[in-house]
Amino acid sequence: MSIYAVIGTQWGDEGKGKIIDFLSSKIDYVVRFNGGNNAGHTIVVNNKKFIFNLLPSGVLQGAKCILGPGVVIDPLILIKELEALKHNNIKTEIFISDKAHIIMPYHIKLDELNEQKKGVYKIGTTKRGIGPCYADKINRTGIRAVDLLDIKIFERKLKINLDEKNEIIEKIYNHKPFNYDDILSKYKKCIAILQYAITNTEEILNQAINSGKIILIEGAQGTMLDIEHGTFPFVTSSNTLITATTGCGIPISKIKEKIGIVKAFSSRVGSGPFVTEILGPIGDKIREKGQEYGSTTNRPRRIGWLDLLTIKKSISLNELNHLALTKLDILNNIEDLKICTAYEFKGKIYDYIPTSCEILENVKPVYKVFKGFKQNIRNISHYEDLPIEAKEYIEFIEREVGVQISILSLGAEREKTIFRNQKWINI
């Protein structure tokens, strides 16, 4: 039995999808434990780009896919992704936790209306209904996948929820209410398609563990978006840390290797503190070259220099024992590269991330400056062949954070990968 976990160390969009896709060729099960279709995974195979928002990235390699209890599921989006796989002749076996909560049309509308009401104080959500769905989960009023298996229960819960949500939509937001029969009709069609996959996924995973199967746990988004430990309130609505994997029925003690994905620079989507943000031509150059646009919303991502405080925090919270560095190839032909090693505020040096967003908005980054490299490194397949400037950048990160960079990704394609630790080739 071997269980591996892949976790984003920044604000998401680190390149987890490519790494997971590569590793999944030897995996029996790939498990997603958090988030919904607010997360996007981009994978390039044979020059064809696949973008998934709900399905785990390992789906293209034939691994059995599990959407765990911590995932919130928009059935319409899931069906669309499954149809895309079928269209491309990709076979997959999917299991949906009967404990997973279901995103409803009123969740999406409330997400949109709430963002509009906040005005300049908006968080920058994807408006996919994620937050309102998790709110119903915490409030213990949400509709779960298991409820879809008994139409009478689903009808009753839909009626109760819709009455409440329509009152909010009409009286607080002065917006047109939803029609019960319209939603019921639409979701009955979804149920007919998806009900075969809804099951007790903890039992499936327990059987897989007991029979020695190889399991890959896939985190969505990143540590700095965690609802508890991220830059609150500019965070997602779920736990993104490895501790959330317990919700899948897998004890953390059983996870053999935990690899954190680090992008060679920083990016984030939406509002919130971003200490190392690069405004101007260099940031624009990195964004365009790296195609840094949200795979879910297509919004341009904000670009910044690599911030080691976020990486150290992620390593500590997730007990990461390996790192994968992605998109180093995007940084060629930049004269000076910077890595943030600390923050400064009113004469005080911070070697950790302050909790207060008000402080974070005003700290100044303390940088270590590196000479850039001009060479196009995308076709390099051995670490020794990298420019010395690129190796200095990599090895400085390793020394500062105390964890080996075991994998280097130098492009979106599977083959553009350098392994510095054979463990990840031989899983």
UniProtKB/Swiss-Prot annotation:
Catalytic machinery residues: D13, H41
EC top class, as a word: ligase
Function: Plays an important role in the de novo pathway of purine nucleotide biosynthesis. Catalyzes the first committed step in the biosynthesis of AMP from IMP.
InterPro entries reported for this sequence: Adenylosuccin_syn_GTP-bd (IPR018220), Adenylosuccin_syn_Lys_AS (IPR033128), Adenylosuccinate_synth_dom1 (IPR042109), Adenylosuccinate_synth_dom2 (IPR042110), Adenylosuccinate_synth_dom3 (IPR042111), Adenylosuccinate_synthetase (IPR001114), P-loop_NTPase (IPR027417)
This protein's pathway: Purine metabolism; AMP biosynthesis via de novo pathway; AMP from IMP: step 1/2
Residues binding GTP: 12-18, 40-42, 301, 327-329, 409-411
UniProt-annotated location(s): Cytoplasm
Record note on cofactor: Binds 1 Mg(2+) ion per subunit.
Family: Belongs to the adenylosuccinate synthetase family.
TM regions (residue ranges): none
EC number(s) stated in the UniProt entry for this protein: 6.3.4.4
Binding site for Mg(2+): D13, G40
Protein name: Adenylosuccinate synthetase
Species in which this protein is naturally found: Borrelia turicatae (strain 91E135)
GO molecular function: adenylosuccinate synthase activity; GTP binding; magnesium ion binding
Entry keyword set: Cytoplasm, GTP-binding, Ligase, Magnesium, Metal-binding, Nucleotide-binding, Purine biosynthesis
Cofactor dependency: Mg(2+)
Classification via Pfam families: Adenylsucc_synt
